[in-house]
From Swiss-Prot:
Organism: Homo sapiens
Gene3D superfamilies, per the entry: Rhodopsin 7-helix transmembrane proteins
Region (Disordered): 1-35, 473-494
Ranges of compositional bias, category Basic and acidic residues: 485-494
SUBUNIT field: Interacts with MTNR1B. Interacts with ARRB1 and ARRB2 in a spontaneous and agonist-independent manner; leading to the internalization of GPR135 in the endosomal compartment.
Biased composition (Low complexity): 21-35
Stretches in topological domain Cytoplasmic: 34-37, 103-125, 186-226, 284-494
Protein name per UniProt: G-protein coupled receptor 135
Length: 494
């Protein structure tokens, strides 16, 4: 029969030893402890204490040792991870934050330009195409201007968005030299072609206003001549914008010839086309149109300042309004010319400067080049804003169909034709809105023989301000229509 073994002391008692000499020991019989047993107990106690200390350090660091690899090896990694989490952001993170804020601001500016240019020019083109009465000579030039600005927004600005999120300094790989070279040529072609068309279209609008106000009525630009001028403008833009450097021998792409450099290059390749081509491009497509704009509006302002009668005989009230509507259109075009020169002037200056210095195209574009290109894009977004400010009836023209409003020649005939949709309160508000601005005109109409219809004529002139989109002249009395020759039609700008 086996003797029952005495109960084993707790682990703490075994590690610390017995306080009495006769106490049982885990290493030997009662009555004393040997040196070997004492050494084993001390070594085990040391290892256990170290392990418990490591576990406590790992738990204080905020992470367990098991996911880091387990045991003693994972505790060091856990302490390092905890320290990394608690480490504050250093000064090296400031450039990253500032770069992100700059990219976000540039993206917002590009988005604003894109929305104004695309939506605004689409609205302008829709107004002209929707209403048959607005398909006139001046509106043909405006349609060309809006089309070029719209194509610039659709084909050039998406590449600028892509450039914002492209790592800086990236160059084209050797395997993609051919496609990359074609992309650079296409980018320059779109930007140059549509910019030239936009500038030439504004010059043609100025020429049309000059012929309408300064020259005799028989010298106005006709439809056939307008189509010829527009065709010449587009062909000139195509001729100067074609990538002629592709016809030469292909050259090695420079390391700095990046996506950013292709997009914001402000001049043709001087190594293949020469500086003379850049100078000729600026002079023929920008400086000469600028001079034509200034010449036309100088004579327009001079004619208006000297005498109204020298432009055409003013013997009816309707002709007075017609003349002032033409002057108002010329004023709007003058505002457009100021913005065109301000937006395209820096670009032309940089092109001439690069041609004079024989700057190489492999140099990265400077900040001035980027700002100059962005200003040319912004010009396409400014023009629709000018239309909307100078003509408060843009929304009315967009919402009105062809048969409404333009079939009649009289405001009083237009108002009842709207039926129950336009109540009496709306009609009175519409009349008061434009009648309050007619102080001088109404005083002049009191001496007019046709004062009975002068109010309707004045209301038509204020309700349909001749800003840009051209249409037929203001309504005249039936008796006056039979006396007036048909060749003296009114201004045809909206």
């Amino acid at each position: 029969m086996e003797e029952p073994q005495p109960p084993r002391p707790p682990a703490s008692m075994a590690l610390l030893g017995s306080q009495h000499s006769g106490a049982p020991s885990a290493a030997g019989p009662p009555g004393g402890t040997s040196s070997a047993a004492t050494a084993a107990v001390l070594s085990f106690s040391t290892v256990a204490t170290a392990a418990l200390g490591n576990l406590s350090d790992a738990s204080g660091g905020g992470t367990a040792a098991a996911p880091g690899g387990g045991g003693l090896g994972g505790s060091g990694a856990a302490r390092e991870a905890g320290a990394a989490v608690r480490r504050p952001l250093g000064p090296e993170a400031a450039p990253l934050l500032s770069h992100g804020a700059a990219v976000a601001a540039q993206a917002l500016v590009l988005l604003l330009i894109f929305l104004l240019s695309s939506l605004g020019n689409c609205a302008v083109m829709g107004v002209i195409v929707k209403h048959r009465q607005l398909r006139t000579v001046t509106n043909a030039f405006i349609l060309s201007l809006s089309l070029s600005d719209l194509l610039t927004a659709l084909l050039c600005l998406p590449a600028a968005f892509l450039d914002l999120f492209t790592p800086p300094g990236g160059s084209a790989p050797a395997a993609a030299a051919g496609p990359w070279r074609g992309f650079c040529a296409a980018s320059r072609f779109f930007s140059s072609c549509f910019g030239i068309v936009s500038t030439l279209s504004v010059a043609l609008i100025s020429l049309d206003r000059y012929c309408a106000i300064v020259r005799p009525p028989r010298e106005k630009i006709g439809r056939r001549r307008a189509l010829q001028l527009l065709a010449g403008a587009w062909l000139t833009a195509l001729g100067f914008s074609l990538p002629w450097e592709l016809l030469g021998a292909p050259r090695e792409l420079a390391a700095a010839q990046s996506f950013h450099g292709c997009l914001y290059r402000t001049s043709p390749d001087p190594a293949q086309l020469g500086a003379a081509f850049s100078v000729g491009l600026v002079v023929a497509c920008y400086l000469l149109p600028f001079l034509l704009m200034c010449f036309c509006h100088y004579h327009i302002c001079k004619t208006v300042r000297l005498s109204d009668v020298r432009v055409r005989p003013v013997n009816t009230y309707a002709r007075v309004l017609r003349f002032f509507s033409e002057v108002r259109t010329a004023t709007t075009v003058l505002i457009m010319i100021v913005f065109v020169i301000c937006c395209w002037g820096p670009y032309c200056f940089l092109v001439l400067l690069a041609a004079a210095r024989q700057a190489q195209t492999m140099q990265a574009p400077s900040l001035l080049s980027v700002v100059a290109v962005w200003l040319t894009w912004a010009n396409g977004a400014i023009n629709p804003v000018i239309y909307a400010i100078r003509n408060p009836n843009i929304s009315m023209l967009l919402g009105r169909n062809r048969e409404e409003g333009y079939r009649t020649r009289n405001v009083d005939a237009f108002l009842p034709s709207q039926g129950p949709g336009l109540q009496a309160r709306s009609r009175s508000r519409l009349r008061n809105r434009y009648a309050n601005r007619l102080g001088a005109c109404n005083r002049m109409s009191s001496s007019n023989p046709a004062s009975g219809v002068a109010g309707d004529v004045a209301m038509w002139a204020r309700k349909n301000p001749v800003v840009l989109f051209c249409r037929e002249g203001p309504p005249e009395p039936v008796t006056a229509v039979t006396k007036q020759p048909k060749s003296e039609a009114g201004d045809t700008s909206l």
